[in-house]
Amino acid sequence: MNGIVVGLLPGVLWMVAVIFAVSIITITVSRGHLFTPKRRRPPVDPVDWSMVKTHFMSFAAALIPFPVLTFTADLMNARMLAFYDHAQLPGAIIIFALVLLELIAMYLQARNASETEMDRRLGVASHRNKDDIK
């Protein structure tokens, strides 16, 4: 029983990291209105520092399964170890792509927030100029 739990631990940790990354991407896409056309996009807030900190936690969670696999490999049976040997590279590529997508989504949200702030300031300036003309 103990060998089964140890054998499943790297896979479970990897799945937690994937869920963590997908949730960060989903929240960022939602808050940043990334798929809303610019003319219909509501005001976008800048990326919260809590999301940036969560991204670093996600990055750490993405790294954890690989050393856990290395340290627990002696306690696993041969079939489980062979599975992880075959799944390790694709798993690393998937988690790397998800962490990279987190960064891209946060960048796009920050860009949309910058456009919102520019529109807000330029809108105030254009109204101020119209008031000066009257």
Residue ranges and their predicted role:
Residues 13-24, 55-61, 117-134:
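Alpha-helical transmembrane segments of integral membrane proteins, especially early/N-terminal helices
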Residues 46-64:
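Interfacial helix-start motif at the membrane-water boundary
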Residues 18-39, 107-112:
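Membrane-water interface of transmembrane alpha-helices
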Residues 84-129:
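Alpha-helical transmembrane segments and their immediate juxtamembrane interface regions
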Residues 60-85:
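Alpha-helical transmembrane segments and their membrane-interface junctions
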Residues 1-9, 78-87:
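Membrane-helix interface and helix-disruption motif detector
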Residues 1-9, 29-48:
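Hydrophobic alpha-helical transmembrane segments
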Residues 3-22, 93-96:
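Alpha-helical transmembrane segments
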